[in-house]
Regions:
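Conserved hydrolase catalytic core segment
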Residues: 87-124
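Conserved serine/cysteine hydrolase catalytic core
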Residues: 175-233, 242, 250-252
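Helix-rich cap/lid subdomain of alpha/beta-hydrolase
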Residues: 118, 122-177, 186-194
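Active-site loop/oxyanion-hole signature of alpha/beta-hydrolase fold enzymes
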Residues: 43, 52-89
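Catalytic active-site module of serine/aspartate enzymes centered on a nucleophile-bearing elbow/loop
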Residues: 236-270
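Conserved HGGG/HGGXW glycine-rich cap/lid loop of the alpha/beta-hydrolase fold
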Residues: 3-63
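Conserved catalytic-core motifs of eukaryotic protein kinase domains, centered on the activation segment
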Residues: 35-37, 62-67, 125-126, 225-226
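Short beta-to-alpha linker loops that shape the active-site pocket of alpha/beta-hydrolase fold enzymes
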Residues: 55-59, 119, 244-246
């Protein structure tokens, strides 16, 4: 494990793998770098890339989250990019895609963006998240109810209440639930203006000029397919790709070759 100090003094923990073009993995809501899937993706890419797999602030071995802020997460990525000679591609998973987008929009030295199923709510027929999601989430975080915040999140991605109750009994959920206080970072990165069933606006993303690959699974939720298409339409330099047979929980064996080819121009076998 390595650490780098972000602009506000927060220590950001990361693991480094391999040699080649640099790619930083930006995990989604509740995730952390030691989650098995993230480690498998990092290992799979390491044959052809220098891979940085990090704990977003407030998670895992990184320092405390502090008040939710897009700017702080962008600063964290800026510090990580400096560890790989000042330029890197970013791979974002789910809401991590929004963090990666904000970093590119802010002018960081981002070579390429590969984004998997950023969960913007662009479909007017989508039921989740509910319009009061952020308000309730803020209250739970203010009360330091991390598990409550995590359960609230799961209900607002469409998980039935009975399944949420069962999930909360699974030991692994405790690790995810411990990151419940960071969920507002994800929501702010997505942007409240992008979470109420309207198309994404091109002007919001006009400064994201780097080559961008927007990927979604053929078996994912219709709302995530809709969001991926809307994102590709809004970005100035994007390619849209459907990944056959994949759901939102993408398999490393399916996504690693896609990232490797896009970032490094290499044929990668996961």
């Amino acid at each position: 494990m390595y650490t780098v100090t972000s602009a506000d003094g927060t220590k950001i923990a990361y693991d480094r793998y391999g040699e080649g073009p640099a790619v930083i993995l930006v995990g989604g809501a509740l995730g952390y770098r030691k989650f098995k899937v993230m480690e498998q993706i990092a290992a799979g890419l390491s044959e052809h890339c220098t891979v940085i797999n990090y704990d977003r602030r407030g998670r895992g071995d990184s320092g405390p989250a502090g008040p939710a802020s897009v700017e702080r997460e962008v600063e964290d990525l800026a510090a990580l990019i400096e560890t790989v000679n000042g330029r890197a591609s970013l791979w974002g998973y789910s809401s991590g895609s929004a963090v990666a987008l904000r970093a590119a929009a802010a002018g960081l030295s981002v070579e390429k963006l590969a984004l998997y199923e950023a969960p913007f709510k662009t479909d007017p027929d989508a039921k989740f998240p509910r319009d009061d999601y952020a308000t309730r989430l803020e209250l739970l975080i203010a009360a330091d109810d991390r598990m409550g915040a995590a359960k609230h999140f799961l209900r607002n991605v469409g998980m039935p209440g009975t399944m949420v109750a069962v999930m909360s009994l699974v030991p692994m959920f405790k690790r995810f639930g411990a990151n419940g206080h960071t969920l507002m970072f994800d929501y702010l990165a997505l942007g409240d203006q992008n979470m109420h069933g309207s198309p994404l606006r091109a002007e919001e993303w006009a400064s994201v000029s780097c080559p961008t690959l927007v990927v979604y699974g053929s078996k994912t939720y219709p709302s995530l397919k809709h969001a991926s298409r809307s994102l590709a339409d809004a970005l100035p330099n994007a390619t849209l790709r459907e990944l056959p047979g994949q759901k939102h929980a993408v398999k490393p064996s399916a996504i690693v070759p896609v990232i490797g080819e896009f970032v490094a121009g290499a044929t990668v076998v996961a």
